[in-house]
């Protein structure tokens, strides 16, 4: 089992940007001190939902302050930057960290990102997949080559050469299209923390079927499960503090994108739009019901309940790497205490899939 920490870098009401960034650094360092296997962060722009806009710089900081843990992105928004810039940043971090950087990617969701950076949101899937393949190929061959579908330029050598023989990487996958793209290439996917186990199982079944058809060893692909976690010996306190955080956090998430508006006609996000409609039909548009749903799915409560939730996900999906976010625990001291309790009373009891 691998257990990593994930930091969203959300700016709660009343906190300054400086406080959020200083906490981000301390949580990264604490992750190594507490024997987590990794520390991951997310890219967002123009919203308090997450204020680490440049993950290459953010990860470089944490890599420079640690010696052992893997530091990764979950993920880099691929369509908003040129693939040559992406691959150079990836290779520099791979060399400087001696292979401790995990290159996690996403296609992007937030309309402001695409508008400001000057790229098409409706073409984001095609662009992300095209760039991702180019970048990973270049990290292996040392040559950045384009097929001309999205961008076109002569082949160029990229520097420095990769440190890692096989680049640690992953991509967040929710729709069948993304899952199929990754499975065809045998690339790892990240599963969402806001869907039930049954849906995660369906995603894994689709992935494994397609990957096997394309000759990949499905037992040798390191997928990642994600969770929001609040662990406390007092289960009611864990539930309450998590709700206080998530109530504002969910509102910030919904307000940062217009994808969920009924009037939005952006193509290419059918899965997320359908998911939101299903939530509305279940009453989950109501903040209280949404928090009930979230806390039921995630390790929120006593150590025993956290073990039960996570282990059931591990056994159902066969995934051996989990990332756990602790920012929903209140103050920085409370976040640290929850991390400590997790590593003391939850992590030792998590087993490989049965």
Curated annotation (Swiss-Prot):
The UniProt keyword set, sorted, is: Flavoprotein, FMN, Luminescence, Monooxygenase, Oxidoreductase, Photoprotein
Report whether Cell inner membrane shows up as a keyword of the record: no
Which GO terms fall under molecular function for this chain's record? alkanal monooxygenase (FMN-linked) activity
Reactions this protein catalyses = a long-chain fatty aldehyde + FMNH2 + O2 = a long-chain fatty acid + hnu + FMN + H2O + 2 H(+)
Q: Does the keyword Flavoprotein apply?
A: yes
- Got a GO cellular component term for this one? cytosol
Tell me a GO biological process for this protein. bioluminescence
Q: Which InterPro entries match?
A: Alkanal_monooxygenase (IPR033924), Bact_Lucif_Oxidored (IPR050766), Bacterial_luciferase_CS (IPR018235), Luciferase-like_dom (IPR011251), Luciferase-like_sf (IPR036661), Luciferase_bac/NFP (IPR002103)
Q: EC number(s) for this protein?
A: 1.14.14.3
Spans through the membrane: none
Q: Which family does it belong to?
A: Belongs to the bacterial luciferase oxidoreductase family.
Write down the PANTHER family for this protein, in alphabetical order.
BLR5498 PROTEIN, LUCIFERASE-LIKE MONOOXYGENASE
Q: What does this protein do?
A: Light-emitting reaction in luminous bacteria.
Q: How does it assemble?
A: Heterodimer of an alpha and a beta chain.
What name does UniProt use for this protein?
Answer: Alkanal monooxygenase alpha chain
Species per Swiss-Prot/TrEMBL record: Photobacterium leiognathi
* Gene for this chain: luxA
